[in-house]
From Swiss-Prot:
InterPro entries: GlnE, GlnE_rpt_dom, NT_sf, PII_UdlTrfase/GS_AdlTrfase. Keywords: ATP-binding, Magnesium, Multifunctional enzyme, Nucleotide-binding, Nucleotidyltransferase, Transferase. PANTHER family: BIFUNCTIONAL GLUTAMINE SYNTHETASE ADENYLYLTRANSFERASE_ADENYLYL-REMOVING ENZYME, GLUTAMINE SYNTHETASE ADENYLYLTRANSFERASE. GO terms for cellular component: cytosol. It comes from Neisseria meningitidis serogroup A / serotype 4A (strain DSM 15465 / Z2491). Gene3D superfamilies: 1.20.120.1510, Beta Polymerase, domain 2, Nucleotidyltransferases domain 2. This is Bifunctional glutamine synthetase adenylyltransferase/adenylyl-removing enzyme. It is an enzyme of class 2 (transferase). GO terms for biological process: regulation of glutamine family amino acid metabolic process. The keyword Cell cycle does not apply.
Length: 896
């Protein structure tokens, strides 16, 4: 392919050179592209997308999208390096392609699952539902880089179900659609990747639902939306064509009705976090995050949007350049400052693109090799890297100067007072305060800065006349209480975070004023565990538990507690939302009570897990009754339905944040039973996992059901038995060793227990079984390397103990039925030793090791323990378990 433009561009791009050299760019397609600005019409004409969708040819769709990206990126590189295009063309072209790719993948995924499950229908409007995709960040502002990932959020209009024979809830349907969309774009194949897809900006991040309804999004933004999320949503843009109400519900969250000067502190804080990371990681040469970089230009534009956008709709824009221009037009910023920022922004973005053109990598760091530096300088129009560096620094210094002028820290104030009040004064004596803080063991500067942030912050300054004196009275007491802890700085930081969190709820401030005896207890709890501190921040209503007489009472009467919960649910009068909130408040209270007792050393890990499992059992039983009562079109008063627990729930090894592995079974001859109980299963799962105003209950995992994600949500007991006998894999029988009946119809319990016993006591070829389990262990190594610091997956760690026990059950329960009792791994090791199946000494050592591992895992979560330290004691435990493994299996699993 001969073209001077190609020769010039390939000199500055290894990526382009590779595409040209390996023949991946056909001249008849590529050369005409170089003479025009690409549009959606060009993307549409590249392949017969309708045919691919009609044929449900997923592999071909993925291939064509990746091939199209190769052409688009190569075209952008050639035109930009040759100065045919400008920054706006580059960013708009790649963003338009991202929009096209998202919509093409979405159309395919939607049609694929619509054909499988029917069209999703709104519960209230009774109209077909479509998924809206919101592009965030640079994708939202038409500002993508060629090697950017894309930040997306998935939103659908309303809850409901599909209208097909294999009915699915809209939440499940759109989750599947979203997952396939992500895979089509994100998966790396032989043809490469379309875009890295980042979903972490969605509500609750990685822990949140992949898709959510508009109502759920609105509720989240109102009740939980944080300042940084306002910043993120400022650029949010719906890239799909379907009707939606997203803009109207997001606008009041991002753009407040008043002049929101709290945005200054929020933006400073965000910038400090970024600056800290930049400093920590030595990223001064990062033209995006370093001083005077792209991010500072973006912050300047967005700070004025955050403050004034609610009153000036003209500022409710997506792009950085258009926002800066509008700031000049409206007189908010001097025109000369805006021109300075625009020139710097264009220069920095051009540099960023050239860094990424080199090898199609998402980088913003200047090169270190002389050769690449010279090439970069030449591509930017400079004769030498030194001249380029001088030009770059001029732009960065100007940006940083303007940034510091606009977002400078407020002046510190000083004055004094007496006793612990010295810690919280309008004008503190800084020298005295720092000295006293150091005297009491605090990181003085960190605490003083935090106290000043609170006093100067939006929340404190806008407290009511009643709330502010209460707030003022609590701060010195928190400082005093934190000083008594082993880690005063961390403790006080958490207490102050909590106080600020609850400050708008005057009732919580009044509680702390009225019950000062709880402050020391609160400090002790928060000092010991950032997890409990976060839990209290999430559910501050739990403060009331601190004055409960039962707080440290370890005598949990679950039957009595279940009865009390039942009464509370009945009092809701059938109000679904009220019942869901009641379940959540009950569960949160018991978890908090257990956590406080745990911190006080009143529980072993094993006993605590028993209590957390009993709590889950109680919640599941209550939720099942509520979900059935809430079901329309049911054919009987009492469901012939049961819940079986697997994994940690089944083995009674739940932790505070464990999800629930569930399998739903039914035994009902009614012709509509399958449909009815599938809907019940879906409804029950929603009852458990949906976040309401009172929070959430449990994350659920239903993948251990027959046929996994491809299987029905609920199975008849007959189908379950048939599957276990004829189709289940060995690993599914391993899972069955930890399964137990939780709640539901007694007859199903009897049938399940029988099936479990018969399956686990079936005659097996022990050599073949051993080989399969070793192979299963080997399959874990690529995704979970057996590092010694990971007590779960290390050789001789938690998984090895579990596999040993599971093998002993599957191989020997026929002869020793006492192995069938679900007592947990520690007890089962002892039983196996008593049966003569394993050496008693090794069994005892492995029990000790397993207890040690569980304590390590538990403390990492609860007590802020660092990553497990590889000590001689730990290695000795690994060694003992490995000895037992070799005794049982004769060989260890191979890593390769």
């Amino acid at each position: 392919m001969s073209d001077n433009r190609l020769d010039t561009a390939r000199h500055h791009s290894l990526f382009l050179a590779r595409q040209l050299d390996n023949g991946k760019l056909k001249p008849e397609i590529f050369l005409p592209m170089l003479d025009k600005v690409l549009t959606e019409a060009d993307f549409q004409a590249f392949a017969d997308w309708d045919k691919i969708r009609a044929e449900e040819n997923e592999e071909e769709l993925a291939r064509q999208l990746r091939e199209l990206r190769r052409y688009v990126v190569s075209q952008i590189i050639v035109r930009d390096i040759n100065r045919i295009s400008d920054l706006n063309e580059v960013t708009r072209t790649i963003t338009l392609f991202a929009d096209f790719a998202v919509n093409t993948a979405l159309d395919f995924a939607y049609a694929y699952y619509r054909d499988m499950y029917g069209t999703p229908i709104g519960r209230y409007t009774k109209s077909p539902q479509h998924l809206s995709v919101v592009a965030m960040g640079k994708a939202g502002g038409y500002e993508l880089n060629v090697s950017s990932d894309i930040d997306l959020i998935f939103v659908y209009p309303e809850s409901g179900d599909t209208d097909g024979r294999r009915e699915r809830g809209n939440q499940e349907f759109f989750t599947k659609v979203g997952q396939k969309l992500i895979a089509l774009l994100n998966d790396i194949t032989a043809d490469g990747q379309v875009f890295r897809v980042d979903m972490r900006l969605r509500p609750d991040g990685d822990s949140g639902a992949l898709v959510l309804s508009e109502t759920a999004l609105e509720q989240y933004l109102i009740t939980q939306g944080r300042e940084w999320e306002r910043y993120a949503w400022c650029k949010g843009r719906v890239v799909t064509p379907y009707p939606n109400g997203i803009k109207s519900l997001v606008r009041p969250f991002v753009f407040r009705k008043y002049l929101d000067y709290s945005a200054y502190e929020a933006m400073r804080k965000l910038h400090r976090q970024i600056s800290s990371e930049v400093s920590k990681k030595g990223m001064a040469d990062n033209i995006k995050l370093g001083a005077g970089g792209i991010r500072e230009v973006e912050f300047i534009a967005q700070i004025f949007q955050m403050i004034r956008g609610g009153q000036m709709r003209a500022l409710q824009l997506k792009g950085t350049q258009e926002t800066l221009k509008k700031l000049a037009e409206t007189g908010i910023m001097p025109s000369e400052n805006v021109e300075t920022l625009l020139a710097a922004y264009r220069f920095l973005r051009d540099v960023e693109h050239r860094l990424q053109y080199w090898d199609d990598q998402q980088t913003q760091t200047l090169p270190t090799s002389p050769e690449q530096r010279q090439l970069l300088a030449e591509s930017m129009g400079f004769d030498s890297y030194s001249a380029f560096s001088d030009g770059l620094n001029i732009h960065r210094n100007k940006v940083n100067q303007l940034f510091n002028e606009i977002l400078s820290e407020p002046e510190e104030q000083t004055q004094d007072n007496s006793e612990w009040q010295w810690a919280w004064q309008e004008k503190p004596d800084e020298e005295e305060r720092l000295g006293r803080l150091k005297e009491y063991g605090f990181d003085a500067e960190t605490i003083a800065t935090r106290l000043d942030q609170i006093r100067n912050g939006h929340k404190y300054r806008h407290l009511s006349a009643h709330a502010q004196p209460r707030f003022d009275a609590i701060v010195p007491l928190f400082v005093q209480a934190a000083a008594e802890q082993n880690n005063p700085t961390d403790t006080l930081m958490r207490l102050l975070d909590f106080l600020e969190n609850i400050s708008r709820r005057s009732a919580y401030l009044a509680f702390l004023n009225e019950h000062p005896q709880t402050l020391a207890q609160l400090a002790q709890i928060m000092g010991q565990s950032s997890w409990v501190a976060a839990y209290l921040n999430k559910y501050p209503i739990l403060l009331d538990e601190l004055i409960s007489a039962q707080l440290l009472d370890t005598a949990f009467d679950w039957q009595a507690l279940a009865a009390a919960l039942s009464d509370d649910l009945k009092a809701c009068g059938g109000d679904t939302e009220a019942q869901m909130d009641t379940l959540r408040r009950f569960q949160h209270a018991q978890v908090f009570r257990l956590a406080v007792q745990d911190l006080a050393g009143l529980w072993t890990v094993e006993s605590l897990s028993d209590q957390l499992s009993a709590l889950a059992d109680t919640i599941l039983a209550a939720a099942l009754l509520c979900a059935w009562a809430d079901m329309p079109k049911k054919h009987r008063d009492t469901p012939q339905f049961a819940i079986v627990g697997y994994g940690k729930l089944g083995g009674k090894e739940l932790g505070y944040a464990s999800d629930l592995d569930l399998v739903y079974l039914y035994d009902d001859p009614h012709p509509d039973a399958g449909d009815v109980y599938s809907r019940l299963a879906r409804r029950l799962t929603n009852w458990l996992s949906t976040a309401t105003g009172a929070g959430s209950l449990y994350e659920t995992d239903l993948r251990l059901r027959p046929n996994g994600d491809a299987g029905f949500l609920a199975h008849s007991i007959a189908a379950f038995e048939k599957y276990q006998r004829e189709n289940a894999w060995t690993w599914e029988h391993q899972s069955l060793t930890r399964a137990r009946f939780i709640c539901g119809t007694p007859e199903i319990q009897t049938a399940f227990d029988r099936i479990r016993t018969e399956i686990l006591t079936a005659e097996r070829d022990q050599t073949a079984l051993s080989g399969e389990i070793i192979e299963m262990r080997e399959k874990m190594f690529p995704t979970h390397p057996p590092a010694d610091s990971n007590v779960k997956y290390a050789r001789g760690g938690v998984v090895d103990v579990e596999f040993i026990v599971q093998y002993l059950i599957l191989a020997h329960a026929r002869q020793y039925p006492q192995l069938l009792d679900n007592y947990g791994n520690i007890a089962l090791l002892n039983i196996a030793a008593d049966c003569g199946l394993i050496d008693k000494t090794l069994a005892g050592q492995s029990r000790t090791a397993y207890r040690f591992y569980r304590r390590q895992q538990h403390n990492t979560k609860l007590r802020d323990a660092k990553k497990t330290e590889v000590t001689g004691e730990l290695l000795a435990h690994y060694g003992n378990v490995r000895k037992l493994w070799r005794e049982v299996f004769g060989e260890e699993a191979a890593t390769a």
